[in-house]
């Protein structure tokens, strides 16, 4: 059977479902490690549905199929599934069923839902079980993705694994393991299964390039009071890394042996295994081992790496300065070539950015695929230009550029919206309101008991005044030499984490009008202590990224005096920090971009 198109692949999937006795099949966006960005080998949802996006689920029944996507991807998903049978389920919108509700409604008593236990989180399976029990339906684990996607499928990643030196990380793997064991003791646990790649990378200072734009190695770690076992393809561990791991009392075992090894554990342990991030196949093995008592709970590594240590912060500040210099040189070249009448496209933007960032001797990789979106394309929050589908830049309107890089000493994420020529009054209004939102968050002060979801509203309020909102979070945490998105904190309407000094978060409000315009202004901020007094502990933010923010689109009379003062002070800092790294011509350009504005 040919499987070159989405309809052909769905037909093959339904045939396999019938042969295996399942009435519904669920394909989540995921790999065995609950990764946000996936190795190409695990992009099964894309292969079956045609949708390229994060945080989504795809469900196929005997007669229909449905795709769940969040607000960042509504526009993109509609375009990518157009012409197929697939129905878009807009997550969080009124009247839209959850995946669990949809699956339960699609099943009759005695029928089964199929899914792959390696790529489904335990939390997802537990939620499905609760919903299906009411219908008398069950879950059957099987791997139809591997059965059907055989031709042209990328191999499992296998890049060299290396150790990030302590001079950058701040602590050795052995020191971090001791910290983790102390945390586990506080939680009433003696062991932990670490499946999430960002947590494992931080814990062991382990890095590789297994996932595009993400310097992680596909691996697991099992930690007890006396042992730490790293499950990884040992052949890909560099001799230097192997020696460093062994010197830190870390034992190496083969990646494919993880289930067998956990099943063979005889030492009694109370094992912390976070249901949200440990895959169902692993969790089942842990639960079925009589020597192990499994405990669900929040992974303490989330907070341990979420609060950057002094060494990490010192290095990441330096990385952001160098990244800002690259951004300045990018903008100078972009403006010069446009002024000279060259034909530039969204793809050209990516090429110029890469040229300047990759010239840094500590550059490793872009931290995500550059989003260079001109005009209406920017209304799609995660738009990506391709050789087949991209826009030519014109001398009018806005160009949104969301980009970043990972260096040996830090990971960056920045968005600027550049005016390329005349703007409409609506474009100016949207830009000014977005900047107002950005500034209000950047200069915010709050008591330390405030949760992230409360701080999120500070950025939204200036847009809410005009009955505008954005269907995404205001900000996310950024790893140190790792994933551009991490936990535990994020500025959105749901996150209950309390910000702590040393936490890094983005500040990126925006306005998105479908097919018309997209505007976003983003800096990374670090949470800092402001004061202690009779009212409590006050916290605030300081910027990590110092790149000029366009002032020409700002409408007069909208920003208040405090917002203008913040912007002028920010630009004073930009010039002071970047000027020493620039030549005379670049400094002159920067001085113009950083000129103070009035009321």
Annotate each predicted stretch with a short phrase.
Residues 1-599:
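Active-site neighborhoods and metal-handling regions in enzymes and metal-associated proteins
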């Amino acid at each position: 059977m040919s499987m070159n198109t989405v309809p052909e692949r769905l037909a093959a999937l339904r045939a396999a479902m019938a042969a295996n006795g399942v009435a519904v099949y669920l394909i989540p966006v995921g790999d065995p490690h609950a990764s946000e960005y996936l190795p190409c080998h695990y992009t099964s949802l894309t292969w079956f549905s045609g949708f390229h996006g994060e945080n989504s689920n795809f469900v196929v029944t005997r007669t229909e199929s449905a795709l769940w996507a969040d607000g960042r991807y509504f526009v993109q998903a509609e375009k990518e599934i157009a012409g197929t049978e697939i129905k878009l389920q807009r997550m969080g919108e009124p009247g839209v069923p959850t995946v669990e509700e949809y699956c339960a409604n699609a099943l009759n008593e005695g029928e089964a839902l199929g899914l792959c236990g390696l790529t489904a989180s335990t939390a997802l399976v537990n939620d499905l079980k609760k919903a299906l029990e009411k219908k008398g339906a069950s879950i059957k684990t099987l791997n139809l993705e591997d059965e059907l996607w055989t031709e042209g499928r990328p191999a499992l990643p296998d890049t060299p694994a290396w150790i990030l030196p302590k001079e950058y990380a701040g602590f050795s793997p052995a020191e971090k393991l001791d910290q983790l064991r102390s945390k586990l003791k506080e939680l009433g646990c003696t062991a932990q299964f670490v499946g999430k790649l960002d947590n494992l990378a931080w814990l062991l200072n382990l890095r590789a390039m297994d996932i595009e734009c993400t310097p992680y190695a596909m691996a697991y770690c099992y930690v007890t009071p006396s042992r730490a076992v790293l499950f990884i393809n040992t052949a890909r561990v560099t001799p230097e890394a192997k020696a460093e791991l062994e010197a830190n009392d870390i034992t190496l075992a083969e990646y494919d042996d993880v289930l067998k090894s956990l099943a063979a554990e005889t030492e009694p342990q109370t094992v912390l295994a976070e249901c949200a991030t440990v895959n169902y196949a692993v969790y089942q093995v842990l639960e079925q081992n009589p020597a192990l008592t499994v405990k669900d709970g929040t992974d303490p590594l989330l907070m341990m790496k979420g609060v950057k240590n002094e060494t990490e912060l010192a290095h990441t500040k330096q990385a952001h300065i160098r990244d800002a210099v690259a951004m300045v040189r990018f903008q100078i070249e972009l403006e010069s070539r446009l002024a000279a009448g060259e034909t530039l496209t969204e793809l050209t933007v990516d090429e110029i950015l890469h040229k300047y960032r990759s010239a840094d001797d500590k550059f490793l990789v872009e931290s995500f695929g550059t989003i260079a979106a001109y005009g209406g394309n920017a209304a799609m929050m995660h738009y990506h230009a391709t050789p087949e589908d991209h826009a030519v830049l014109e001398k009018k309107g806005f160009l949104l550029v969301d980009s970043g890089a990972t260096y040996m000493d830090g990971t960056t994420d920045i968005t600027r919206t550049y005016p390329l020529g005349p703007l409409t009054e609506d474009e100016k209004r949207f830009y000014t309101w977005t900047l107002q939102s950005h500034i209000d968050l950047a200069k915010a002060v709050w008591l330390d008991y405030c949760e992230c979801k409360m701080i999120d509203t500070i950025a939204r309020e200036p847009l809410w005044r005009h009955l505008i909102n954005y269907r995404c979070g205001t900000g996310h945490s950024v790893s140190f030499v790792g994933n551009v998105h991490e936990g535990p904190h994020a500025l959105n309407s749901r996150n209950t984490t309390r910000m702590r000094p040393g936490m890094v978060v983005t500040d990126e409000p925006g306005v998105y009008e479908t097919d018309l315009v997209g505007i976003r202004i983003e800096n990374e901020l670090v949470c800092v202590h402001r004061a202690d007094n009779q009212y409590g502990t006050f916290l605030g933010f300081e910027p990590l990224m110092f790149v000029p923010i366009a002032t020409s689109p700002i409408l007069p009379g909208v920003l208040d005096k405090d917002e203008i003062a913040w912007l002028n002070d920010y630009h004073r800092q930009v010039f002071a920090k970047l000027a020493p790294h620039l030549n005379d011509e670049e400094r002159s350009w920067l001085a113009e971009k950083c000129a103070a504005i009035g009321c």
